[in-house]
């Protein structure tokens, strides 16, 4: 079986905006993803949502409608309790065990990675693509900066085997 390249793009999407859709469209032009799963958080532990889960889910469905290779994954919206990335990553890795999974996140989220639940395990089981976000520079002396220095690759092919790399 030929493995697929699957991106996972999670967030609160409160609200979803043009920046979110532009990032995905740009990634699809640059990287040969077979699919990108957009996953709205159900109960994000780092943020308080203003809109209801149903409203955010509807916004995400509308924003990404018609973009090839995009699927909206509702698993976190329907999960009880906090939405931890490690749980979702484990589920996706089990479901798509023959495929290459890349977790997509903004530099703002990655700069706080060491505050995430089971963050070290998360970093060790999945490859991450960090998207630069205006006004959110990663301090090279922070934990996130250190992780980038230790795990960074500039070659997408490096993500086709193993885990724990950062692009």
Question: Model-found features: residue ranges?
Answer:
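Nucleotidyltransferase catalytic core that binds NTPs
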Residues: 1-167
């Amino acid at each position: 079986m030929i493995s697929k390249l699957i991106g996972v793009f999670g967030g609160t999407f409160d609200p979803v905006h043009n920046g979110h859709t532009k990032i995905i469209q740009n990634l699809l032009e640059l990287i040969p993803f077979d699919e990108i799963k957009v996953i709205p958080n159900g109960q994000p532990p780092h943020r308080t949502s203003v809109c209801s889960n149903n409203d955010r889910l509807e916004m995400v469905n509308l924003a990404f409608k018609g973009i090839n290779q995009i699927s909206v994954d509702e698993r976190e919206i329907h999960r009880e309790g906090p939405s931890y990335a490690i749980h979702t990553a484990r589920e996706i890795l089990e479901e798509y065990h023959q495929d290459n999974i890349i977790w997509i996140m903004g530099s703002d989220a990655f700069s706080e990675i060491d505050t995430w639940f089971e963050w070290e395990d998360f970093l060790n089981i999945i490859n991450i693509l960090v998207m630069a976000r205006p006004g959110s520079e990663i301090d090279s002396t922070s934990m996130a900066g250190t992780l980038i220095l230790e795990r960074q690759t500039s070659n997408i092919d490096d993500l086709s085997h193993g885990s724990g790399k950062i692009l």
